[in-house]
Amino acid sequence: MFTLPPVLNSSYVGIHGNSTFINFEFSFYTLPMLFLLVPILYIPITIIIILRILVKLYYAFRDRNNNVYLLSAISISQCMCLLFFLADFLYLRLPTSGLLTSWCASIEPNRFITILTIFTYHINYSTMIFPFLVSIMRLILIISPKNHKKFNGQLLRFSIPFICVYPIIFTFFMFPAIGYCSYAAYPFPFGAIIFRIERTFFGLVNNFSLLFNTLFWMTCCIITNFILLLLLIKSRCLLNAQTRSMHSYKVEVSLSLTTFSMIFSYLSNAMIVFLLLELHIVGHYASPIW
């Protein structure tokens, strides 16, 4: 029989109640603080891209464009990326900057940190699937140009609920946990903290499942885009020179850039997971509930 964990004793968990961290004085001149400011560069660009895609989606709905489902998937994907940036900012960048250290050391372990942890992992797992979904929809567009609207519509209606539910498989064991603040080990400077959780179901951790999902969806995305590229090259050879220069070449360049950006995002995510595993940050869950 499962029971919810009692509130953790702050005297022996993380930095809670530790006077050294309570009296910590934050400094702007640290490397984690620089990383905290990095999102200022790419989040506005992401918002502009999302707005442009939404405008195109509006006109696609108005004009009954056949690519409306593909544009819808891309729009949702970009919105999920924006949520991921927000989760990454709150879960990793903000605490490691040292801004929350004194405050976090003066409070008790709580479930708000658990909620933030679950939200971050949920968004991360969901975001991984969208590049593969967009690639499949583009593949359907090439393979079945006459019926792609029907197939892509059915695929999108199935995929959205699946993407919402799928991450629960890898986060359900976090639901009864208690979140707390812990100091971040080297190479982070003194005062940098990270969020962790205690007492998950069965003592399950999220490190290898996160790595598995990253590699799995990256592999699926690479295979799908490789097939797309082959089909695109084949179709390009069948077009006349004028059509090829005006249409196929632009699509091929766009596809190549899209493929590269997708693979790069997976690789960067995998490298971060490897780094955090090395630092014992990802999946540091203890004291299982029975």
Curated annotation (Swiss-Prot):
* Compartments, as annotated in UniProt: Membrane
- What are the transmembrane regions? 31-51, 70-90, 112-134, 158-178, 185-205, 213-233, 262-282
Which InterPro entries did the record assign?
7TM_GPCR_serpentine_rcpt_Sru (IPR003839)
Highest taxon listed in the record's lineage: Eukaryota
Q: What is its main location?
A: membrane
**GO cellular component terms?**
membrane
Q: Does this entry carry the keyword Transmembrane helix?
A: yes
Q: Keywords of this protein's UniProt record, alphabetized? A: Membrane, Transmembrane, Transmembrane helix
Q: Provide the protein name.
A: Serpentine receptor class U-26
Name the species this protein comes from: Caenorhabditis elegans
Record gene name? sru-26
